[in-house]
């Protein structure tokens, strides 16, 4: 007590507490804390299963496509110019993908009736880059509910919260995701690259090799490095026919004509 003044012990106010940082998967929007989790399947994981209605009838993925490679890809919206150019290219290349043992499956968050009307318009009215009367016969998923798009992490809120980005999932015959490519809404895909990645993955699996930068079919492949000192010594003393070693860990070779023909046959 100091005269008429009472001095009380200091108590830390609740307003002085250290700020509590929200979890990393939590965002604060308009003063409301909302938990938002965005699950994105990763390379090497099993592709998530789903059932869906498509322009080719109902599908069960991956059960309906056992033993096949699959390109599962999303586009932002029907009746848009960049997506139209892509679907014309996918349609024109569909037989090429079939020869590679690969099934195309498209997706957007549009309805089945929208898909059908759009594909009909592409076939009957659109001409682009020398392509016309393109008849798209691979499945295009009705995903108005955004179920599949969310399952595969195709909705990127920073780009759009209501449209899928241009995602491409390369899925092998065992339903394992082997590669993923994303493009933004305004940029159409590079179809030569899509084909290169598919052929590259098939080459890797068939011949147990790796592929160097900018590899294209017919280029040299990278052979496995020695795993022991004995193997390293054998490689230096008796290099395999057709193998060029740039150093002990970096050796390449050309696929033989028989191997290249085997790839062409599929």
Set out the residue ranges of the language-model regions:
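Extreme N-terminal basic, low-complexity initiation segments
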Residues: 1-12
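Generic short N-terminal amphipathic or hydrophobic helices
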Residues: 6, 26-27, 31
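Chalcogenol-based redox active-site neighborhoods
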Residues: 31-266
């Amino acid at each position: 007590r100091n005269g008429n003044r009472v001095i009380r012990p200091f108590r830390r106010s609740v307003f002085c507490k250290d700020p509590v940082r929200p979890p990393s998967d939590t965002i604060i929007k308009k003063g409301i804390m909302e938990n938002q989790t965005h699950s994105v399947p990763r390379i090497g994981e099993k592709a998530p299963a789903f059932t869906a209605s498509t322009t080719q009838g109902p599908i069960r993925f991956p059960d309906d496509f056992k033993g096949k490679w699959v390109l599962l890809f999303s586009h932002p919206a029907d009746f848009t110019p960049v997506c139209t150019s892509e679907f014309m290219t996918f349609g024109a290349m569909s037989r090429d993908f079939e020869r590679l043992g690969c099934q195309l499956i498209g997706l957007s968050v549009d309805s089945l009736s929208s898909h059908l009307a759009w594909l009909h318009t592409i076939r009957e009215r659109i001409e682009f880059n020398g392509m016309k009367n393109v008849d798209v016969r691979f499945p295009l998923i009705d995903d108005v509910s955004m179920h599949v798009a969310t399952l595969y992490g195709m909705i990127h809120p920073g780009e759009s919260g209501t449209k899928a980005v241009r995602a491409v999932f390369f899925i092998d015959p065992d339903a394992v995701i082997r590669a993923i490519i994303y493009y933004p809404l305004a940029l159409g895909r590079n179809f030569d690259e899509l084909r290169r990645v598919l052929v590259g993955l098939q080459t890797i699996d068939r011949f147990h090799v790796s592929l160097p930068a900018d590899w294209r079919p017919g280029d040299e492949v990278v052979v496995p490095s020695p795993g022991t000192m004995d193997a390293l010594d054998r490689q230096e003393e008796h290099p395999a026919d057709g193998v060029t070693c740039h150093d002990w860990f970096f050796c390449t070779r050309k696929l033989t004509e028989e191997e290249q023909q085997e790839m062409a046959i599929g």
